[in-house]
From Swiss-Prot:
GO MF term (any one): growth factor activity
Subunit structure: Antiparallel homodimer; disulfide-linked. Antiparallel heterodimer with PDGFA; disulfide-linked. The PDGFB homodimer interacts with PDGFRA and PDGFRB homodimers, and with heterodimers formed by PDGFRA and PDGFRB. The heterodimer composed of PDGFA and PDGFB interacts with PDGFRB homodimers, and with heterodimers formed by PDGFRA and PDGFRB. Interacts with XLKD1. Interacts with LRP1. Interacts with SORL1 (via the N-terminal ectodomain).
Function (record text): Growth factor that plays an essential role in the regulation of embryonic development, cell proliferation, cell migration, survival and chemotaxis. Potent mitogen for cells of mesenchymal origin. Required for normal proliferation and recruitment of pericytes and vascular smooth muscle cells in the central nervous system, skin, lung, heart and placenta. Required for normal blood vessel development, and for normal development of kidney glomeruli. Plays an important role in wound healing. Signaling is modulated by the formation of heterodimers with PDGFA.
Listed GO CC annotations: extracellular region
Biological process terms in GO annotation: positive regulation of cell division
Family: Belongs to the PDGF/VEGF growth factor family.
Protein's UniProt name: Platelet-derived growth factor subunit B
Keywords: Developmental protein, Disulfide bond, Growth factor, Mitogen, Proto-oncogene, Secreted
Coiled-coil stretches: none
Cellular compartment(s): Secreted
Record carries keyword Secreted: yes
Transmembrane regions listed in the UniProt entry: none
Amino acid sequence: SLGSPAVAEPAVIAE
């Protein structure tokens, strides 16, 4: 959600 820092988010990041 936030972008790079996966804070309380699933392992799926915008990378």
